C-alpha cells in the first residue's frame, strides 16, 4: 500500500503543477459542468450511499452526516455553481512598489499546492472540498472514513469524469484507501502534500495533530456554549437556544452547553420549553435540575456529570450549568471551549462588550445563534471547514484561506553591490 500511495502523491503533485496554468474561465467552466453532471451521477452516488448507510445504526449521530438524497445533491450542485461565480482568489496583488534601484516588487496570491483532507462520514465534503480547491488552484488528496468509502468513491469517479471531459489531469483529485494505514502515510508525506486539514471529531483532529509532519490546520470540532446573562431577554434566549441546538444538531456549530446566570434560573423552564418539541435530553447541574423538575419531561431530564461539560454531543443533547457571574461563565468557557463558536444573550452593553472582548474563539456572538458559523452565511461562499486555530486561518476557511503568496521581482539587469 505504501508504494502505491506514494506514487499517487507524485501524480497529484504533477497535476498541481499543471493546474497552475489553467485559467479562471476554464476552472469556472469545469465547476459548472460538474454541477450539471451531478444529476446524471445521482443514481450511482445514492446507491453507494445506501450501502454505506446500511452498515450504520440510524441512531448514530453520524447517520445524518452520512446521508445523501436527491434534495441534498441538488443543494450540493447549487453550491458548486455558486463557487463558480465567486471571484478568483488567485493572482491578486497584495503589495506593489518600486525600489530606489528600479526593481519592481509585487506580492501576489498563489495556490497552496496540494491539500490533503482527512474527514469522517460526510460525503458532501468530497464535493465541497474539490470545488473550493479547484477554484483556488489546488490539487487535492482525500482520505475519507471507511463509513463513507463507497459514497466517496462514487463521487470521486463522477468528478474525474468531468475532469477528463474537460481535458484536465484527473489526478487533480485522488481518493486514498479507507484503511487507517493510508492516513499515516499521508500525515508524513512532507515532500508531496503542502497542508492537511482534518474535518471530524475531536478524536480525529487530535490524532492528526499528534502524528502529522505535514503542516495542519485544525477545523471542525466544536464544544459550543451560550451564556444567558442575568439581563437577558427571555424570549430571545428561548428562540436562540432552540435554533442553536436543534437546527442541525450533528454539525460543529450546534450548541452543546448552556450557561445560565443564577439570577435567571426562574426563566429557565420558559427558555428550555421549546426544546421539548425536539425531545432534547438535558443534563442539568443541581440548581438547574431543581428548577426544571416538573416543567421539563422527566424522561428527557438527567443530572449532569462532569464529562457532560466537555462533550461535543452532535445530537439532541444539551448540558446546562448555573453560574453566579459573567466571570464564572468566562472561566468555564476558557476551560472547556474548543475555540469554535461562543455566544452571550444579554441586554447589558457592558456585559456584552466584556464577553466579546474576552472570549477566545474563532467566532463570538451576542444575542444570536451560533448556527451562523458558516462560510456561506458570512458571505464568503462555501467553506472547507471552520478553523479553530490562529495561524494562517481562523473561522470559516473559504477561498482566500486556501491560498498563499509569493513575491514577483522584475528588473533590467540590477545587481546587488553590498
Curated annotation (Swiss-Prot):
One of its GO terms (molecular function) is glutamate-5-semialdehyde dehydrogenase activity. It is an enzyme of class 1 (oxidoreductase). CDD domains: ALDH_F18-19_ProA-GPR. Signal peptide: none annotated. GO terms for biological process: L-proline biosynthetic process. It is found in: Cytoplasm. Keywords: Amino-acid biosynthesis, Cytoplasm, NADP, Oxidoreductase, Proline biosynthesis. Transmembrane segments: none annotated. Its main location: cytoplasm. It holds the Pfam family Aldedh. GO terms for cellular component: cytoplasm. Pathway: Amino-acid biosynthesis; L-proline biosynthesis; L-glutamate 5-semialdehyde from L-glutamate: step 2/2. Catalyzes the NADPH-dependent reduction of L-glutamate 5-phosphate into L-glutamate 5-semialdehyde and phosphate. The product spontaneously undergoes cyclization to form 1-pyrroline-5-carboxylate. This is Gamma-glutamyl phosphate reductase. It comes from Chlorobium limicola (strain DSM 245 / NBRC 103803 / 6330). The gene is proA.
Amino acid at each position: 500500500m505504501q508504494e502505491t500511495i506514494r506514487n499517487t502523491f507524485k501524480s497529484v503533485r504533477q497535476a498541481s503543477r499543471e493546474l497552475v496554468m489553467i485559467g479562471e474561465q476554464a476552472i469556472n467552466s469545469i465547476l459548472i459542468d460538474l454541477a450539471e453532471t451531478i444529476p446524471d451521477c445521482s443514481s450511482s452516488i445514492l446507491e453507494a450511499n445506501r450501502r454505506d448507510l446500511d452498515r450504520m445504526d440510524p441512531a448514530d449521530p453520524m447517520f445524518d452526516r452520512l446521508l445523501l438524497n436527491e434534495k441534498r445533491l441538488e443543494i450540493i450542485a447549487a453550491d458548486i455553481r455558486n463557487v463558480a461565480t465567486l471571484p478568483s482568489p488567485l493572482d491578486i496583488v497584495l503589495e506593489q512598489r518600486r525600489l530606489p534601484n528600479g526593481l519592481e516588487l509585487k506580492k501576489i496570491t498563489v495556490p497552496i499546492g496540494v491539500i490533503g483532507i482527512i474527514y469522517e462520514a460526510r460525503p458532501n465534503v468530497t464535493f465541497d472540498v474539490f470545488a473550493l480547491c479547484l477554484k483556488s488552484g489546488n490539487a487535492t488528496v482525500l482520505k475519507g472514513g471507511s463509513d463513507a468509502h463507497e459514497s466517496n468513491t462514487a463521487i470521486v469517479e463522477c468528478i474525474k469524469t468531468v475532469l477528463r471531459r474537460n481535458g484536465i489531469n484527473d489526478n487533480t483529485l485522488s481518493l486514498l484507501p479507507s484503511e487507517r494505514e493510508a492516513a499515516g502515510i499521508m500525515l508524513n508525506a512532507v515532500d508531496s502534500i503542502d497542508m492537511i486539514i482534518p474535518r471530524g471529531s475531536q478524536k480525529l483532529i487530535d490524532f492528526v495533530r499528534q502524528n502529522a509532519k505535514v503542516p495542519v490546520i485544525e477545523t471542525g470540532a466544536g464544544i459550543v456554549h451560550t451564556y444567558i446573562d442575568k439581563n437577558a431577554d427571555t424570549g430571545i434566549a428561548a428562540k436562540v437556544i432552540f435554533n442553536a441546538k436543534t437546527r442541525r444538531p450533528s454539525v460543529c456549530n450546534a450548541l452543546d452547553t448552556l450557561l445560565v446566570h443564577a439570577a435567571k434560573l426562574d426563566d429557565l423552564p420558559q427558555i428550555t420549553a421549546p426544546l421539548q418539541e425536539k425531545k432534547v435530553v438535558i443534563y442539568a447541574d443541581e440548581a438547574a435540575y431543581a428548577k426544571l423538575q416538573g416543567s421539563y419531561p422527566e424522561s428527557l431530564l438527567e443530572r449532569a456529570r462532569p464529562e457532560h461539560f466537555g462533550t461535543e454531543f452532535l445530537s439532541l443533547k444539551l448540558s446546562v450549568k448555573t453560574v453566579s457571574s459573567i466571570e464564572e461563565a468566562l472561566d468555564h468557557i476558557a476551560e472547556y471551549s474548543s475555540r469554535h463558536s461562543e455566544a452571550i444573550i444579554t441586554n447589558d452593553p457592558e456585559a456584552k462588550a466584556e464577553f466579546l472582548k474576552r472570549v477566545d474563539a474563532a467566532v463570538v456572538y451576542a444575542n444570536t445563534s451560533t448556527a451562523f458559523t458558516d462560510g456561506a452565511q458570512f458571505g464568503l461562499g462555501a467553506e472547507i471547514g471552520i478553523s479553530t486555530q490562529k495561524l494562517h486561518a481562523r473561522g470559516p476557511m473559504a477561498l482566500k484561506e486556501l491560498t498563499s503568496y509569493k513575491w514577483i521581482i522584475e528588473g533590467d539587469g540590477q545587481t546587488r553591490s553590498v
